From Swiss-Prot:
This is Delta-actitoxin-Afv1a. It is found in: Secreted; Nematocyst. Its main location: secreted. Keywords: Cardiotoxin, Disulfide bond, Ion channel impairing toxin, Nematocyst, Neurotoxin, Secreted, Toxin, Voltage-gated sodium channel impairing toxin. GO terms for cellular component: extracellular region; nematocyst. The keyword Secreted applies. GO terms for biological process: regulation of signal transduction. It comes from Anthopleura fuscoviridis.
Length: 47
């Protein structure tokens, strides 16, 4: 999957670990949405 920046990772992508994964159809079972705003396409989810 494509990595994304969770709210808990920090304010921007530079120098931070991207712990989320982008899911286009929503977070799968057992995962949660970890970013309050965005991404533009899909959801940023983590286990």
């Amino acid at each position: 999957g494509v990595a994304c920046l969770c709210d808990s990772d920090g304010p921007n992508v530079r120098g931070n670990t991207l712990s989320g994964t982008i899911w286009l159809a929503g977070c799968p079972s057992g995962w949660h949405n970890c970013k309050a705003h965005g991404p533009t396409i899909g959801w940023c989810c983590k286990q």
